[in-house]
Amino acid sequence: MSAGASATGPRRGPPGLEEATSKKKQKDRANLESKDGDARRVSLPRKEPTKDELLLDWRQSADEVIVKLRVGTGPVRLEDVDAAFTDTDCVVRLPDGRQWGGVFFAEIQSSCTKVQARKGGLLQLVLPKKVPLLTWPSLLKPLGTQELVPGLQCQENGQELSPIALEPGSEPRRAKQEARNQKRAQGRGEVGSGAGPGTQAGPSAKRAVHLRRGPEGEGSMDGPGPQGDAPSFLSDSATQVEAEEKLCAPPMNTQTSLLSSEKSLALLTVEKTVSPRNDPVAPVMVQDRDPEPEQEDQVKEEMALGADPTALVEEPESMVNLAFVKNDSYEKGPDSVVVHVYVKEIRRDSSRVLFREQDFTLIFQTRDGNFLRLHPGCGPHTIFRWQVKLRNLIEPEQCTFCFTASRIDICLRKRQSQRWGGLEAPATRGAVGGAKVAVPTGPTPLDSTPPGGGPHPLTGQEEARAVEKEKPKARSEDSGLDGVVARTPLEHVAPKPDPHLASPKPTCMVPPMPHSPVSGDSVEEDEEEEKKVCLPGFTGLVNLGNTCFMNSVIQSLSNTRELRDFFHDRSFEAEINYNNPLGTGGRLAIGFAVLLRALWKGTHQAFQPSKLKAIVASKASQFTGYAQHDAQEFMAFLLDGLHEDLNRIQNKPYTETVDSDGRPDEVVAEEAWQRHKMRNDSFIVDLFQGQYKSKLVCPVCAKVSITFDPFLYLPVPLPQKQKVLPIFYFAREPHSKPIKFLVSVSKENSSASEVLDSLSQSVHVKPENLRLAEVIKNRFHRVFLPSHSLDAVSPTDVLLCFELLSPELAKERVVVLEVQQRPQVPSIPISKCAACQRKQQSEEEKLKRCTRCYRVGYCNQFCQKTHWPDHKGLCRPENIGYPFLVSVPASRLTYARLAQLLEGYARYSVSVFQPPFQPGRMALESQSPGCTTLLSTSSLEAGDSEREPIQPSELQLVTPVAEGDTGAHRVWPPADRGPVPSTSGLSSEMLASGPIEGCPLLAGERVSRPEAAVPGYQHSSESVNTHTPQFFIYKIDASNREQRLEDKGETPLELGDDCSLALVWRNNERLQEFVLVASKELECAEDPGSAGEAARAGHFTLDQCLNLFTRPEVLAPEEAWYCPQCKQHREASKQLLLWRLPNVLIVQLKRFSFRSFIWRDKINDLVEFPVRNLDLSKFCIGQKEEQLPSYDLYAVINHYGGMIGGHYTACARLPNDRSSQRSDVGWRLFDDSTVTTVDESQVVTRYAYVLFYRRRNSPVERPPRASHSEHHPDLGPAAEAAASQASRIWQELEAEEEMVPEGPGPLGPWGPQDWVGPPPRGPTTPDEGCLRYFVLGTVAALVALVLNVFYPLVSQSRWR
């Protein structure tokens, strides 16, 4: 050939040669592209710029990197995109053959990566950083810096493997090129970089270790290489060692597992390389014996058919231990852990999960090509084994698993209810059976979010601490794992701790509200994952100005599981009734759905519900503006509005109320419910509405009317405010010490029968044999009949209850007598005249006492007559001790028996002491008889001021001795003289008594000594019947005239029921054997059952409220019922009973009472309600079901403050979809824009107002997702218009949602409590603020008027 020909020949060449060469290239290219899992790339010049063309943009945040690829102009189907990720690199293959990939600048969390489709033919990759807060200067590493981590070698059972020889005949020219390129010479190079031809087509997979049994004692023998030849093992060669290190030490993601066995196990190490065909370090398979002939033939056959030479021979009995499988896990409540293992196309017939107390093992086979490509040499018949050593013990018998199309779901039941904080046990503990486990250096699966949630990585400081804790664990492993566990960059350079980093937020145990799965028809998934600022369910609501009532209701309803799931995926649009005049045309339903999404996306710290408020205000003008309203009222209107928007009834028929007319209740109730559903049929009705039975009874004709009505919530009344009254109970016999009881009664509308009934149960005495009396100033103020009101009785008043003898028991008439005690001489000292105020000058001018009361003194009768008009109302004897009632049969009413009873009762309330006898005192027989008339006259004239007026001339004056001689200096005897009663509280003035000159008692009158001795008096047995009595007994008749009783021996006394008795103690010091007497605190025993009555006085239970709700009541006159039989309005008796209970039960505690426009009140008493297992079986008389109607609490609305101003908050949890006893998100406190976690024990407070209960084991079936035309076939062409209308409303509300700014802060503009104040308005409405302050000032003035005028009148009326 000529030179020119030789020069141009290679370019042009003969036509036949060029055509043959082109056809050969096309055939080779088609063969390579048709093979599944081929790791080789075809070096084509046109694919070199693919990477630059695909990469559109990338950006990073503190914890993730987002890469956007330009795929094309049309929609992208994620099913056709093949993406594989490791912690260091990735590769993305498109359906048209294009691909993108590379080695990242730093490590990522490959298990948390996401591939998302976007509008405009974009593909978005979300790559969570393994090291948060680490700034990446570039997305990919430069080509010259992608080096391996030196020093890692492959080992087996603690010994290094022999070096692997390079095959001499494997394209030496290519090997030289790879040797010059450090990046391509490593065992695992850049993936999909697209930097030049021949780049690897798939990602560098994690190292898999395959195990095969071999005879003990046999060494490793040659096996088939990539070309079908057995590689030889070289020894002590630098080149071989370097090749071994490059093969056995891939960076970061090499993971190896060893399976323990009784026989020796041979190690098979398989790794996908950069270029399987041309790489000099081709993967080999180490075996313990020569391959079988059948296997060798199979390998040759696969190579002849163009199979991948790097793939292992498929063996049905091979077992591959996996150190890591893509998974995540989360704790489902305190008792379970859910693990999701993401492997597709599982062969269910040969896959299973084995559970033990400390671990579980997943054994499976898969046909997923992407998974098999990550494990070279594995095929559909390969058995994979993944064993996880658990952090704590489990119950193997209660653990379950199930297979889905894309994953395996494993549910682990904890042995103890506690928080694990992670799934796997620390690496130093090893796996069960003695095998070592290579634990990933990244965060544990529980550190990631549950499925569907965004990543919540640790802060840099916490990540550094986590690495420091795991470093000694990795080093403590034996040498068998040194070549498996790769070091992370954190072990070289720990991130600098940031002192300003906030503490991590609580872990969310529930996935956020999921969106519809992305498909080829739907690529409009929101880009909200990158905007998350809080955990799902922790978004607050901004207070727009006294709108805390609305915020608390919305937060409670958003945690209603069925309602939340119903609105999350737009399937409710099929049920929107756009033509309902009572609704909003779907705007309220769609606005509520938009708000629910905002609360569960986690993209707002606080969201403004202004659009929903505007929609509600457009239908209910009372909610216009920013004034306070009742939360229950707003909740009822909101649910009713949602019901009307979702009402399935297009044309409501006319229905009438169904009455019983003697038919069975079951028939009438079902008929009434069906009639209600003819007009009201929606998801709100299915979820919230129940049915109760209303029974009306006419008081005149006894006509009974029974109807069945629906209810949305139960307004249960609270028991009225209670007061605790101390009651002193006296038994029928005086030898029993009085007992003090504490009885709770209502502050309003209480009667004496409540106290008598309560005491009757305590002392086991019939109520008709008890008498209740009030004591004021040591005398009976009044004796209550059972019907008498106790509203005017305060807890400080003294109430005595006496047991009386029953006439049925005595078989004769029983005499009941009131007895009061008083001294013969009052203990009040007299130092001056009551009329002229002149003090006593000398002994000759002694002041004379009034003989009626002995409490005042006068100079003469002139002063007495002058002072009588003023003294008349106060002239009464001085009483001491407590009065009491005695009941004696008429036949046994003797003086001795009466004296015995009186002395027995009196000793509990007075202290009596009789000093030793002194001979110098006057005897009774030596007294002048003239003084008897004086005393008799005085006694007859003694009485209350209510009797007939007495002229002053009829009164007698007695002359006491000088006050200096009254014995005021007398003291009690020493304590060693005998059992002297306590003198505490007894002053010297009380001991002083002025003796009366010449005024003795009746001569010769003696009273037999009662059987019971008076405390403080020491006497011998022979002198018991010889001493004088210590008191006298006087009879007081109906006209208040007193007469001293005489001892008639065994003859019964003649006393009527209209008289009373007075016990007069002989305390005149001038008389023989006088006594010292004074009042004392009543001696009594405390009732042990009343110890907690005071604490329970202000506490009620929900059962008590439900009992009041179901108790019959009489209708008020303005609510009178029209009796169809009497043809008149009657104040009938009405009773409500529960018949049908809903799935979600709302209970309103009626804390607010409105008596009038001015008089309003709120009850702040504690109502104890169960958080778990509210049993309503005793209140529900209707549905007889096998399962009891048990409910669990999931939300509470609280109200703080009073009627004028207050604040609403809410506590809620998100119950599990299948069990209301478990929570997917725990209890949180919603205080407007602030959301914090709370303990379940803090939910029950005295401020609870509205309770939300969810029924156990009674889920509500959601309606099937159908098109609007399918649900309403009668609409015809209007279905498309309705659907487009819903779409327009969605776009409008979502656009307004984006324009609404976020809340100003966690506390909102009004602080933690939004007491009434001016709302945040603009300057265009200044008059509204003035009007608001004017209204507030008026209300404050009315309150002050009530407190200053009406309250004193009410407080004084009780004393009248």
Swiss-Prot record:
Residue spans, topological domain Lumenal: 1355-1360
Membrane protein topology class: Single-pass membrane protein
One GO term describing the cellular component: cytosol
Entry's EC annotation: 3.4.19.12
Domain USP as annotated: residue spans: 539-1256
Any single biological process term in GO: response to endoplasmic reticulum stress
PANTHER family (alphabetical): UBIQUITIN CARBOXYL-TERMINAL HYDROLASE, UBIQUITIN CARBOXYL-TERMINAL HYDROLASE 19
Name this protein carries in UniProt: Ubiquitin carboxyl-terminal hydrolase 19
